[in-house]
Regions:
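Glycine/serine-rich anion-binding loops at beta->alpha junctions
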Residues: 54-90
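Exposed boundary/loop context
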Residues: 4, 8, 18, 40, ...
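Extended polybasic, low-complexity segments that bind anionic RNA or targeting/receptor surfaces
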Residues: 1-46, 91-206
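A short, flexible low-complexity segment enriched in Lys/Arg and Gly/Pro that occurs
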Residues: 30-68
């Protein structure tokens, strides 16, 4: 099992913690991590784009002028693509962007993402994030003490003070342990996680 240093909110070392290899020490599968990120971003797409093709635009059934003798270029319909108000060639239509992964793959991808961050020393474990008040200044001070930039803050449960304190800090995001996901883990420079959150993650994924 990997040993990591545990810090307090002042950035001082207060002990060590063993991380479960079944979650934080697996063989990293980069393909699954990539697939999980692609899936998450694709599944957020709305997919309701729509434009009308030539056959769907109203009007244009009559030839605008005769074929020859007018001096104009020949035209067959005022709803052809080159006309203002005409149809769109290869117009976008509503579609479902969903990418599927089974549960086993999703779990393996998250474990790989967490392991990769541990190996790269991007995981900072804190004994607690017990903020007395919801103040951005206090959270910024904690993150500075922990040398955590572009941080993902993971708590055991949703913590109102942590959420309110961090929401106005650029490139900082909060998530409860039960909502942790591959994209958030991989898109932040540092994962700041409480001891209780580590226990919650290990309980679910070990």
């Amino acid at each position: 099992m990997a040993n990591v240093t545990v810090y307090n909110m002042e950035g001082n070392e207060v002990g060590t913690m063993e991380l479960n290899d079944a979650v934080f020490g697996v063989e990293v599968n980069e393909h699954l991590v990539h697939l999980a990120v692609v899936r998450q971003l694709a599944n957020k797409r709305q997919g309701t784009q729509k434009a009308k093709t030539r056959s769907e635009v109203s009007g244009g059934g009559r030839k605008p002028w005769r074929q020859k003798g007018t001096g104009h270029a020949r035209q067959g319909s005022i709803r052809a693509a080159q006309w203002t108000g005409g149809g769109i060639i290869f117009a976008p239509t509503p579609r479902d962007y969903e990418v599927k992964m089974n549960k086993k793959e999703r779990r393996a991808a998250l474990k790989s993402a967490l392991t990769s961050n541990v190996q790269d020393n991007k995981v900072v474990v804190v004994d607690s994030l017990a903020l007395a008040d919801a103040k951005t200044k206090e959270m910024q001070k904690v993150l500075t003490n922990l040398k955590a930039e572009k941080a993902l803050i993971v708590t055991a449960q949703e913590d109102k003070n942590v959420i309110l304190s961090a929401r106005n800090i650029e490139n900082v995001q909060t998530v409860a342990a039960n909502g942790i996901n591959v994209y958030d883990v991989m898109s932040h420079g540092t994962v700041v996680v409480t001891k209780d959150a580590v226990a919650s993650i290990e309980e679910v994924y070990a």
